[in-house]
Amino acid sequence: MQIINWASLLLVTWETVVAAELPIVDLGYQRHQAIGFNSTGRYYQFSNVRYAEPPLGPLRFSLPVSPRNRSHEVVNGKGLGNICPQSQACWFNVQGDFVSAVTAGSTFNFTAAYDQVYQQDECTKPRPVADQNPLESEDCLFLDVYVPEKVISKRRDGNGKSNPGAPVLVYFQDGAYVSGSKSDQNPSGLIATSREDGSTGIIYVGVNYRLGVFGWLSGQKFQSEGGLPNAGLYDERLALEWVQRHITKFGGDPSRVTVMGVSAGGGSITMQLTAYGRAIRPPFAQIIAQSPAWEPGTKTPAIEDDLLDSFLTLLNVSSLEEARRLPSQALLDANYELVASRPYGSGVFGPAIDGSFVPDSPKRLLLERKVDPSVRILTSYTANEGFMLAPANVTDDATFNRYVDVLLRGANASVRAHTSRVLYPPIFNGSWPYHSQHERANLLWSEVSTTCNTRYLHQAVATPGYAIEYAVKPAMHLSDTSSVFYNGQGSSSSLNATIAQLMQRQIVQFVKTGNPNVKGDPHVPLYHGQAHVLSLGDNGVRVEPALTNTDRCTYWQQVEF
């Protein structure tokens, strides 16, 4: 086995290569040249490859359209690098202070933290221009392709015939459907791990998709005015179809595509699996769904219409058609302000039932197995998913019940009462898996929004899959991302280099073979029957029962809300 020199990956070394020597790929609509060669990782990077027309003007809030213009000009993506417009709910700032205090063993004054963020009314004011990332642009539907040197060189043999292609890993980023970009993660560690066995390695594709109001507005009123719900899902789908059409030109195998994502990225992958209720075969063979997140109880018709009305009010217009004609900066500002001002503890955007791409609740589609049964699945979740997302002000029954009302806004009074009294009762004597009101809210968010979703995925497909639990403390939502993309850097308490390298080997092995098990490493069990997972923690690696093997998960999949 080839040994990775992780210290060398600390330095991002881009070798100076004469432009004429960098590979060029003819995509039909443009000729795209690699922007550089990483001499440490031995891979080429093709940056900012356009996969859709700019979603501006009449294409705002509409289907993404494949590039129309044909050009023989060679481009390399330099000077583009746009990211989709970003935003974040202000209450996340309070939660960040809470997490920092608790993990440091300090006391946390919620009122003081809340007042500091909210009392000065910063969350309802327009964002200062200086705070905006200059790369933010509606023209953001680009992707990056990272290709190992040997994959490029072996695209064709000496007789001009195509060689068997390399496996492909497509990544959708996290960000609560309102932030993030294809550039958030550095895949150099994964690529290096994929070459440990002496093979050519894997191709990595990072994708931008529309966020916030640009990608996730929905509802009857929005549709009646010509808006397309779930535009972000259609962006992702077009990118996956782009991979199917073009990845052979980079040396990849379109029949060996794995889609990976965490949080919103994992939730998006779930929607891609259930898309159209199995009416159309998915453009991928495997998924790696990490903490697949969506909040099914937060999308009611009234909430959807209220979001649209609030957005139009911020723009000082009365219709979506008028919004389409406004300058881009006006929409960027309104998007930011709308998300920032959302009520404490509430989600804002995400997938919605639209009768087409999302024909029904994904949990119900999975229950009815309306998916391609041949798709192979690897899932993961963290042991403490809801720690940073359950509101810090849940300290008694009254605040817990208010949180239930926020999280399950689409549920009726009976479901909410059952949640508080039966599913998550205020019992803290050790007989339930929580010892405080915040831990109670933590478990509620975890099961409703992420962990139970992994169980639904496994039960929907024909072939038993695999599951991993990330238990390195604090093991909260997203804390495993630094391990997945470990490249020799990082010294935080949430990163264990041994665990990180193990996770990377498991991921790469799954991408290559559909099985995450590597000879000599701890065995990842099949997820079936009693549902066991491989738990990766500070105190060792062991097989344990899945946190999802509960009656509560069964209830959440079957109840209407």
UniProtKB/Swiss-Prot annotation:
Pathway: Mycotoxin biosynthesis; patulin biosynthesis. Its EC number is 3.1.1.1. One of its GO terms (biological process) is antibiotic biosynthetic process. Substrate binds at residue 263. Patulin was originally used as an antibiotic and specifically trialed to be used against the common cold, but it is no longer used for that purpose since it has been shown to induce immunological, neurological and gastrointestinal effects. Genotoxic effects of patulin with dose-dependent increase in DNA strand breaks in brain, liver and kidneys have been detected in mice. However, more recently, it has been proposed that patulin might also have anti-tumor properties. It is an enzyme of class 3 (hydrolase). It holds the Pfam family COesterase. SUPFAM superfamilies: alpha/beta-Hydrolases. Keywords: Cytoplasm, Glycoprotein, Hydrolase, Signal. It comes from the Eukaryota. Disruption phenotype: Strongly reduces the production of patulin. The active site is at residues 263, 385. It catalyses: a carboxylic ester + H2O = an alcohol + a carboxylate + H(+). Residues 1-19 form the signal peptide. Induction: Expression is correlated with the production of patulin. Expression is positively regulated by the secondary metabolism regulator laeA. Expression is strongly decreased with increased sucrose concentrations. This decrease is lost in the presence of malic acid. Expression is increased with pH changes from 2.5 to 3.5 in the presence of a limiting concentration of sucrose, 50 mM. Natural phenols present in apple fruits such as chlorogenic acid or the flavonoid epicatechin modulate patulin biosynthesis. It is found in: Cytoplasm, Cytosol. GO terms for cellular component: cytosol. Glycans are attached at residues 38, 69, 109, 316, 393, 412, 429, 496. GO terms for molecular function: carboxylesterase activity. Carboxylesterase; part of the gene cluster that mediates the biosynthesis of patulin, an acetate-derived tetraketide mycotoxin produced by several fungal species that shows antimicrobial properties against several bacteria. The function of patB in patulin synthesis has still to be characterized. The pathway begins with the synthesis of 6-methylsalicylic acid by the polyketide synthase (PKS) patK via condensation of acetate and malonate units. Belongs to the type-B carboxylesterase/lipase family. This is Carboxylesterase patB. It comes from Penicillium expansum. The gene is patB.
